[in-house]
Amino acid sequence: MDSQKNTNLALQALEVLAQYHNISINPEEIKHKFDIDGHGLNQTKWLLAAKSLGLKVRTANKTVDRLPFLHLPALAWRDDGEHFILLKIDQETDRYLIFDLIQKNPIVLDKNEFEERYQSKVILIASRASIVGNLAKFDFTWFIPAVIKYRKIFIETLIVSIFLQIFALITPLFFQVVMDKVLVHRGFSTLNVITVALAIVVLFEIILGGLRTYVFAHSTSRIDVELGARLFRHLLALPISYFEARRVGDTVARVRELDQIRNFLTGQALTSILDLLFSFIFFAVMWYYSPKLTLVVLGSLPCYVIWSVFISPILRRRLDDKFARNADNQSFLVESVTAINTIKAMAISPQMTNIWDKQLASYVAVSFKVTVLATIGQQGIQLIQKAVMVINLWLGAHLVISGDLSIGQLIAFNMLAGQIISPVIRLAQIWQDFQQVGISVTRLGDVLNSPTENNTASVSLPEIQGEISFRNIKFRYKPDSPMILNNINLDISQGEVIGIVGRSGSGKSTLTKLIQRFYIPEQGQVLIDGHDLALADPNWLRRQVGVVLQDNVLLNRSIRENIALTNPGMPMEKVIAAAKLAGAHDFISELREGYNTVVGEQGAGLSGGQRQRIAIARALVNNPRILIFDEATSALDYESENIIMHNMHKICQNRTVLIIAHRLSTVKNADRIIVMDKGEIIEQGKHQELLKDEKGLYSYLHQLQVN
């Protein structure tokens, strides 16, 4: 391979890795800065170039066996310049997914094939944003700052716990005095004093116990609110790709795992831990009474731990299975309710019921196994507790008979042992709940640890004018999927009306998604007014871009609120003006409550054409500089479509408009028509110009529609 090609591979690797980390890159600028002599990017220059983009990089020499422990993707550097990117390693099958920079495609290699390519040199890459994200990773450590934040409340709880433990220590001593002194000497006056004192202790114990529970619940509720608020904010900030890669029910199931964490935080787990911390005081008093009996109690503690450790892995696997089945049920339920019209129309309720019954039976079976295993765990703990009680009774009775221990001391000892064993038993049982919470934290982590589409490099730019440029765009939704857009180069002038046509799956809608920055291209740049959208704030961009889709979702609010969704305080005059422009004002005025009519869930109270016109009004009300119609009129009746087309000149005035349509009549008056096929632009021009090429795709589509 010649040096020029080697240079290109190193630069291509930097491009791919930068795009992976959502970092904009200009290859020509990199060559200008770091390839001054024209000999290409060697390892040193490559590292400097990567650091200039904000990437954290370091070199390492690693054997093949050590690669699974690295943070991927990473660049495998070769002396001959045939570098490649290591994407993923499947340790079970010894398969290696790499991105071949020569073929420009991901390929899978077995271990022998990989070892032939790999030369033990690897460059580890991470973006600064991802490093910050990892530091803030959601797991059990997330709760530590929250505890520190409310440390005053927790310190107060700790103080209350100390007093509770003192009271718990005093009570057995009272019983010892009664048994050994009062009963023997018939000291009624002493009995009265002890009874009053014990009643006061019990009263304070109840009050302080309730106060501790209240304070703890109050503080954990604050943590719960913070976690819930953070979860929803993060969920809305996730990129479209996150939701497209997951079922709705699966996402809902993960969010509902917050309930498990809430129940755990507000339960007895944390108070039991506090009680256990003071156990050493009880052990000291118990040792004073009887070292032999104390050793029996101490010997039981490892038994609780061993039993819990034995049960936990099995329980965790069952809980994982239970969550997966529950997620399947959630997904199927959401899908069924969403598609209820189709289910009714096709009379497939029996088939759907059959599927639901099978899934439900599977879930119930798994839940039953979890319950059985949890019961076995709890009964095992009870068995250990009863065994300790029997041994202590037998040994204690021997000690009393031999005169080494009084009856009062035996009773007091058993009460103190109960104070130690009780939190241990609770914790052993709570350990099973902890397994469920651990899974819940992991599931929630899938949401909270996923990177949002905003990044630290995002900047708000001046008001959009409307000039759009696509430069050498290549894009696909998944690394192992075919290219959706390939070598797209397109310049759209400010105020130009562009029609985009082509067969289904040709990449028309994907092109507009890049304009909305739903995705970052694998290669190339999308520019608006000369600004790279990879560096732009998505919210700044989308506030100035109006979009009307084929299937628009209306919220369960009034028509006015749906139109003025982005600005609830918008003057009514602007709402009405947008509705008139969209041809919606007349039918809205005929409704009994006019603009205050609640449309129902997803606009169920309106016809398809009415929903579409409200969606168009919603897109127009903010006076966007860029307007995208993605099959926006395909669902309209001819009368509604005629109203929209009649107003199209006003709608397009002083705006850059992109109209995606299958009906060519919708775009024939556009300033320019773009014809796409298989992810490429194959024709462009005005309607009449394109018809002159009788062998062209546009002419072919036009002929089909005419006939």
Swiss-Prot record:
Q: Does the keyword Isomerase apply?
A: no
Q: Which terms in the GO cellular component ontology are assigned?
A: plasma membrane; type I protein secretion system complex
Q: Explain the induction of this protein.
A: Levels of toxin expression vary greatly among strains. Highly leukotoxic strains (JP2-type strains) produce more LtxA protein and ltx mRNA than minimally leukotoxic strains (652-type strains). Variations are probably due to different types of promoters.
PROSITE patterns documented for this protein:
ABC_TM1F (PS50929), ABC_TRANSPORTER_1 (PS00211), ABC_TRANSPORTER_2 (PS50893), PEPTIDASE_C39 (PS50990)
Q: Where is the ABC transmembrane type-1 domain?
A: 158-436
Taxonomically, the superkingdom here is Bacteria
Known EC number:
7.4.2.5
**What are the UniProt keywords, alphabetically?**
ATP-binding, Cell inner membrane, Cell membrane, Membrane, Nucleotide-binding, Translocase, Transmembrane, Transmembrane helix, Transport
Q: Which GO terms describe its biological process?
A: protein secretion by the type I secretion system; proteolysis
Q: Which residues bind ATP?
A: 502-509
Self-association state and partner proteins as the record states: Probably part of a complex composed of LtxB, LtxD and TdeA, which forms a single transport channel across the two membranes.
Please explain the role this protein plays, according to its UniProt record: Involved in the export of the LtxA leukotoxin.
What is this protein's name? Leukotoxin export ATP-binding protein LtxB
This protein's species is Aggregatibacter actinomycetemcomitans (Actinobacillus actinomycetemcomitans)
